[in-house]
Design a protein with these regions (language model features):
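Sterically constrained small-residue positions within well-ordered secondary structures
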Residues: 12, 36-38, 51, 72, ...
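Positively charged n-region of N-terminal signal peptides that target proteins for export
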Residues: 1-7
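Bacterial N-terminal signal peptides
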Residues: 7-17
Length: 182
């Protein structure tokens, strides 16, 4: 005879498996028409990772400084942006227009309301500092893709459980449920 606890766990497992099977198709990043066909959501300021991280070779952790010590990655403070763009005005009219938005936000003391791109369900914890410690700066690219080549950042990985587990298996780290679900 099955205990009540075992029955509940079995029901949850079967429900999760059914949901997973329903949404098991390959992830396709959305294409946003109002940003010239670029993938990903339109942000309040068109931040060019391909210029900052690619052309200018600014390391991820220069702007995302708290990622190595905090559980949440954190969006860079406007102070980080204005630190450079107080002096750097942009090389093209479109870049100058976006930098003007940064300067205006700084002057008005109103940081942009960025749209989150890489979101996990509320029941999943992804402590960035642990991943940075284990994988070094390669951890950024492994999950976020080659942002140095992205004019606009978009989600390249599914960030679904199977994708995460395969990385844990490959790197021979714990697959205990409580590592990510607590």
């Amino acid at each position: 005879m099955m205990t009540k606890t075992l029955a509940v766990w079995l029901c949850l497992a079967l429900s999760a498996a059914a949901l997973s099977a329903q949404s098991a198709g390959r992830y396709q990043a959305p294409v946003v028409s109002d940003t010239g066909g670029l993938k990903g959501p339109r942000q309040p300021i068109f931040f060019r990772h391909d210029i900052h991280a690619g052309q200018d070779q600014i390391p991820c952790m220069y702007c995302h400084a708290t990622v190595a010590v905090a559980s949440e990655p954190g969006i860079p403070a406007l102070q980080t942006c204005i630190g450079c763009h107080q002096l750097i005005g942009g090389s093209t009219p479109s870049h100058q227009g976006e930098i003007k938005k940064v300067r205006d936000a700084w002057r008005e003391r109103k940081p942009p309301e960025w749209i989150r791109i890489h979101a996990l369900p509320g029941f999943v914890r992804f402590p960035h500092q642990r991943h940075i410690k284990a994988l070094g700066t390669q951890a950024c690219t492994r999950c976020h893709g080659d942002v140095q080549k992205m004019p606009q950042v978009y989600q390249v990985s599914t960030l679904r459980m199977g994708w995460c587990v395969s990385c844990h298996v490959q790197n021979k780290v714990s697959r205990d449920c409580t590592v990510c679900h607590y």
